[in-house]
Amino acid sequence: MEQRVSLVTLGVADLAASRQFYEALGWTSTSSPEDGVVFFRAGPMVLGLWSRAELARDSGTKDTGGWGGVTLAHNVRSPTEVDEVIGEARAAGATIARDGAPTFWGVYSGAFLDPDGHTWEIAHNPHWTLGADGAITLPG
């Protein structure tokens, strides 16, 4: 298996509302809720939105409703940009889990929850370089 991730699909309660939220963040969808799924190009990856019930059924699991132990991360080029993105999320209707602040491991980050409670960390890591396409270059 090649070492990469192609698609992350989030289970959502209201596909149209979730699409509207991500579009309010400035993202452009490539499909409509009438298709039953919404896709957003995210650099070399794709973010999908699909009904929680359908996603659970397709995955062969049960939708237990609680936090699934996954956090999505969006790395940026400066602490100022962390604060800007958290502000954009707030304006789009996100629940802010924590405003941008320094962490004990040297990163500046904040976090928000989308309408379905999916956690997004917005982070500036001074030890990682971001390419023009947003790809992370890991040290070593």
Where are these regions (language model features)?
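Vicinal oxygen chelate
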Residues: 4-13, 41, 60-140
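Short, flexible, glycine-rich and Lys/Arg-enriched loop motifs at helix boundaries
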Residues: 52-64, 129-131
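Core segments of cupin and vicinal oxygen chelate
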Residues: 9-56
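Short hydrophobic-acidic sequence motifs that mark active-site Asp/Glu residues
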Residues: 4, 46-48, 119
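N-terminal beta-strand motif that seeds the catalytic metal site of vicinal oxygen chelate
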Residues: 1-16, 69-74, 126-140
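Short, hinge-like loop/turn segments at secondary-structure boundaries
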Residues: 48-49, 65, 116
